[in-house]
């Protein structure tokens, strides 16, 4: 498995991945406080070679949150690309992510985070932290939800 975090580059990289809006029964959004920067973000990550996006998000959610998700419980929200998906990493890497965004309302397991996170917490939609890593993805989800 080769993920961009393992490489050291000083040019812009293009990376495909997936992220998830995970909602609890109170309609709160799960965010992770990332260990590599002082920002809250959505669970998700990069796609492995030959992997389907559905498998990417199911794997990333399990790795990062310990939650189990079934493919039939994935709701496609959007595919997001462009400059809004630019990430400047502390090691100097610059990555533009093509991100498949899912919404997940049904899952099982006990929430536990891995070493990629300092903390995880469900937030009320109107009380999200200001220091977000994925504000564009959250806004896309909120806009789509409002238009339904």
List the predicted regions and their residue ranges.
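Acidic, metal-coordinating catalytic segment for phosphate/diphosphate chemistry
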Residues: 1-19, 25, 92-93
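Short connector loops at helix/strand junctions that flank enzyme active sites
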Residues: 15, 35-37, 42, 95-99
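Short helix-loop capping/hinge motifs at secondary-structure junctions, enriched
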Residues: 28-29, 108-112
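Short, well-ordered beta-strand micro-motif
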Residues: 22, 101-105, 122-124
């Amino acid at each position: 498995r080769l993920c961009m975090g393992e490489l050291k580059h000083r040019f812009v990289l293009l990376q495909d991945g997936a992220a998830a809006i995970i909602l609890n029964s109170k309609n709160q959004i799960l965010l992770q406080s990332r260990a590599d920067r002082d920002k809250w973000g959505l669970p998700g990550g990069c796609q492995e070679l030959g992997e389907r996006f559905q498998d990417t998000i199911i794997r990333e959610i399990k790795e990062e949150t310990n939650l189990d998700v079934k493919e039939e419980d994935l709701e496609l929200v959007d595919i997001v690309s462009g400059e809004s998906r630019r990430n400047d990493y502390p090691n100097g890497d610059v990555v533009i992510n093509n991100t498949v965004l899912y919404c997940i309302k049904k899952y099982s397991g006990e929430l536990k985070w891995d070493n990629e996170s300092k903390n995880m917490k469900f937030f009320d939609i109107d009380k999200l932290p200001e220091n977000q890593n994925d504000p564009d993805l959250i806004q896309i989800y909120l806009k789509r939800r409002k238009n339904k």
